[in-house]
From Swiss-Prot:
Assembly, per entry: Heterotrimer of A, B and C subunits.
Gene name of the record: gatA
PANTHER family per record: GLUTAMYL-TRNA(GLN) AMIDOTRANSFERASE SUBUNIT A (PTHR11895:SF151), TRANSAMIDASE (PTHR11895)
Lineage: Bacteria, Bacillati, Bacillota, Clostridia, Eubacteriales
Catalytic reaction(s) noted: L-glutamyl-tRNA(Gln) + L-glutamine + ATP + H2O = L-glutaminyl-tRNA(Gln) + L-glutamate + ADP + phosphate + H(+)
GO biological process, one term: translation
Protein name, entry field: Glutamyl-tRNA(Gln) amidotransferase subunit A
InterPro entries with a match to the protein in the record: Amidase, Amidase_CS, Amidase_dom, AS_sf, GatA
Family, similarity comment: Belongs to the amidase family. GatA subfamily.
Active site: K76 (charge relay system), S151 (charge relay system), S175 (acyl-ester intermediate)
Length: 488
């Protein structure tokens, strides 16, 4: 699969038709999807129909086809799409078709993109492995016995496996960046409020953000510019448009000051991962950046605070799924309350039920102050740590994850161990900051990601830093050795 930028150029120049591009993507999906499991829905008829319309517009001389015209894209299945199911990878929403498009989907269509399908995910975005989907496990294209990360598991796997050049994911505590790191692609978690959440099924409303995933920084930046911007339908939208990004010339980080939080590059980080990230930091220095060690002392409390705030918001948001208005409804219920109980018990998976119960507990009258209020106080401390760091530094550098992808099933019975894998990404969500994961090497054949964290609304700045790093390295060009049959 060619890059999104190149596909767009070839299509606009008439060297490739949109139908040819769509058919090529569908052929690749047919080859590898049985092994990878990146999609819940493959919208073959839809994408061919869309491609024919784009071809007709180009032949008619339309010069405003858009920066994503002719580009296939996968959309995470918690983002509403009219005409396609939106299941959130849950039995409780199986068969549900939204009557409207999310704002980000509207913008994709306006930019000429071809939505090729809905990507698999952890159920209701609650997970870090891609194993909790009601529609099957997604596998890592680099090692089919390992997880691709989550919760945007299918989005990451689809891009890494060459099924689509771009994908949309959502990130609540690392759900774009962690799978991007595990699968060797680029993933951006934008500043909270930069991208509309209208039409995105909520997990934790104060943490969720939609973002782009792709094989290189230029493609991710192109998609970010399409989806970001004001939206009055989203009360949490910041009403800001990002500055235009221009890549070119010799890569240089002269004058850029980078901080490396000691809490996130010390004990608990796999030695191989640490070595790759330290090599990447040395490369940033060679590009002209000034690098210093810094401290984010409240980081040690971030994980605990997150798993109070996130589950509390989830228990509230998921109360709407009761079997009355839409989605799955349990049969043979003796009354209304039994119908609610059976529907939710049968419709939700284990991880979702675990988080709903925890959220209900921390919001209860006897525990609100001890847990939820205290977690919000810790969140304030995390924000202040970042504010102090950014008084001195332009961006911060950390590993994206403390270890590489684990084997499927390895952590299913130990959710706390899985939660600990988000230690580098969760503080960013608590503070509402932008962060991008870029490939920085391999450990035992498995990809490693470096995370660049920026100031609020400095998304374009961290993308520029990531681009400079990408220009002098080749890690993003590596491809998994999937055969035509989808095996290794």
């Amino acid at each position: 699969m060619l890059s999104a930028a190149r596909l767009n150029r070839l299509f606009l120049a008439g060297e490739l038709s949109a139908v040819e591009i769509a058919e090529s993507a569908l052929s690749r999906i047919a080859q590898v999807e049985p092994a990878v499991g990146a999609f819940i829905t493959v919208a073959a008829d839809h994408v061919i129909e869309r491609a024919k319309k784009l071809d007709a517009r180009r032949k008619a001389g339309d010069t405003e086809l858009g920066p994503l015209a002719g580009v296939p894209i996968a959309v995470k299945d918690n983002i509403c799409t009219s005409g396609m199911e939106t299941t959130c990878a849950s039995r409780i929403l199986k068969g549900y078709v939204s009557p409207f498009d999310a704002t980000v989907v509207e913008r994709l269509r306006a930019a000429g993109a071809m939505i090729i399908g809905k990507a698999n995910m952890d159920e209701f975005a609650m997970g870090s492995s891609g194993e909790s989907s009601a529609f099957g496990v997604t596998r890592n294209p680099w090692d089919l016995e390992r997880v691709p990360g989550g919760s945007s598991s299918g989005s990451a796997a689809a891009v890494a496996a060459g099924e689509a050049p771009l994908a949309l994911g959502t990130d609540t505590g690392g759900s774009i960046r962690q799978p991007a790191a595990f699968t060797g692609i680029v993933g951006l978690k934008p500043t909270y409020g930069y991208v509309s959440r209208y039409g995105v099924v909520a997990f934790a409303s104060s943490l969720d953000q939609v973002g782009p995933m792709g094989r290189d920084v230029e493609d991710v930046a192109r998609l970010f510019e399409v989806i970001a911007g004001p939206d009055r339908r989203d009360a949490t939208n910041a009403g800001r448009t990002p500055p235009a990004l221009k890549f070119g010339g010799e890569p240089s980080l002269s004058g850029v000051r980078l901080g490396v939080p000691k809490e996130l590059l010390g004990p608990g980080i796999d030695p191989g991962v640490k070595a790759r990230v330290e090599e990447a930091i040395a490369q940033l220095e060679e590009l002209g950046a000034t690098v210093e060690e810094c401290s984010l002392p409240s980081t040690e409390y971030a994980l605990s605070a997150y798993y109070v705030i996130a589950v509390a918001e989830a228990s509230s948001n998921l109360a709407r799924f009761d079997g009355v208005r839409y989605g799955y409804r349990a049969a043979q219920a003796g009354g209304l309350h039994e119908m609610y109980s059976k529907t939710r018990g049968e419709g939700f998976g284990t991880e979702v039920k675990r988080r709903i119960m925890l959220g209900t507990y921390v919001l209860s009258a006897g525990h609100y102050d001890a847990y939820y209020r205290r977690a919000q106080q810790v969140r304030t401390l995390v924000v202040r740590d970042f504010e102090r760091a950014f008084e001195r530094y332009d961006a911060l550098v950390t590993p994206t994850t403390p270890f590489t992808a684990w084997k499927i099933g390895e952590k299913v019975d130990d959710p706390v161990s899985m939660y600990l894998g988000d230690i580098c990404t969760i503080p960013v969500n608590l503070a509402g900051l932008p962060a991008v994961s870029v490939p920085c090497g391999f450990v035992d054949g498995l990809p490693v990601g470096m995370q660049l964290i920026g100031k609020p609304f400095a998304d374009t700045q961290i993308l520029q830093i990531a681009w400079a790093y990408q220009k002098v390295t080749k890690h993003h060009e590596a491809r998994p050795a999937l055969t035509e049959e989808g095996g290794r």
